[in-house]
Amino acid sequence: MWPSDVGIVALELIFPSQYVDQVDLEVYDNVSAGKYTVGLGQARMGFCTDREDINSLCLTVVSRLMERWSIPYSQIGRLEVGTETLLDKSKSVKTVLMQLFKDNTDIEGVDTVNACYGGTSALFNAISWVESSSWDGRYALVVAGDIAVYAKGSARPTGGAGAVAMLVGANAPLVFDRGVRSSHMQHAYDFYKPDLSSLYPTVDGKLSIQCYLSALDHCYQLYCSKIQKQLGEKFDIERLDAVLFHAPYCKLVQKSLARLVLNDFVRASEEERTTKYSSLEALKGVKLEDTYFDREVEKAVMTYSKNMFEEKTKPSLLLANQVGNMYTPSLYGGLVSLLVSKSAQELAGKRVALFSYGSGLASSMFSLRISSDASAKSSLQRLVSNLSHIKPQLDLRHKVSPEEFAQTMETREHNHHKAPYTPEGSIDVLFPGTWYLESVDSLYRRSYKQVPG
């Protein structure tokens, strides 16, 4: 018998203390007004100086979660990190995090890598561990973190950075639905990092969008099929209270929500198409695989789903809009955004679907139920209260000019694998409690310190 109500007990999320404004970036890049803000749906982009790397981000988010929630480090029995920001081809980020755990060395797990999907894989592994015969009663800790950077050009505004830590255990306020998880895995060269000496990926933008939408189709169809068997009745998007997506940029998320409506329309009965989907009648007979770049179809389903998007998905886009694409934490930044957008009473009892995508490609759709107990001392109320700092902290960030941002990117590009190396970035602008890179010695050994506070 597995433990009851396995899910997310606690959440912590961090983002860089500086950002560049996308309006300023449009002017600096000499592109049309609205290209980044309207076309991509992005407002601000967080970024790291050379003082922060994937190790420091993960050190910060883990120490913050443990302190805020007063969790003894001895209570962690599994720790797994999902990331695609690799500093070492052998040594895992998880092993770097072990310096926080002092005498507790009995901790399973290492790193999981596949583009933006690694955090989800780590989460699934954590759930499986808690539900397995290997579980020893302690918590599993899942960390997802990345620094998303692109070379100069049209993709650079879709960068971002951040990390999330999720404490997984029994009797959780966010409980994962069992038996409905669906996955789609496929070989594709849509986005990959074959040049190990470079910070930047190789990207086929059009193929990447096609792969994302195709994976979404497959996962949603399978998810609906599985949950219909459990419920014994038809299931569509209207049965979900919130739908969260991996967010490369916000406009793609809006298109993705509309894509689920298109899926529902395609598999609807003739009667439903006439009554429920009358405004989409012109789409009768369309094949999903022919519609990835069909502007007319896209416009029709986006118009139809506009109110649905506002209700079910837009509340999850705060961090995607204000920080950018955090890669592996992106989807879970959506979950945090949802949790800080409403009160515990408004969230109680809701079912949330999540779509995770990582290029190459790996994808899954799964769902969770939010506890119906929103009383003053409930685990849900505590979870929401312990995320109340997120919105105010976004406003405490330091705004940086596009020129300084470009110079920072150049510094990172030239020095990211240099040894010995002493970072140039200022420590003064970092948030209190932030871990930062102090130095890299001649043997590439990295040393870290923590900002007081």
Swiss-Prot record:
EC number(s) per entry: 2.3.3.10
Keywords: Lipid biosynthesis, Lipid metabolism, Steroid biosynthesis, Steroid metabolism, Sterol biosynthesis, Sterol metabolism, Transferase
One GO BP: farnesyl diphosphate biosynthetic process, mevalonate pathway
Gene Ontology terms, MF aspect: hydroxymethylglutaryl-CoA synthase activity
Keyword Cell inner membrane: no
Pathway participation: Metabolic intermediate biosynthesis; (R)-mevalonate biosynthesis; (R)-mevalonate from acetyl-CoA: step 2/3
Keyword Transferase: yes
Positions annotated to bind (3S)-3-hydroxy-3-methylglutaryl-CoA: 33, 116, 158, 208, 246, 255, 325, 359
PANTHER family linked to this entry: 3-HYDROXY-3-METHYLGLUTARYL COENZYME A SYNTHASE (PTHR43323), HYDROXYMETHYLGLUTARYL-COA SYNTHASE (PTHR43323:SF2)
Family label: Belongs to the thiolase-like superfamily. HMG-CoA synthase family.
Protein name as it appears in the record: Hydroxymethylglutaryl-CoA synthase 1
Species annotation: Blattella germanica
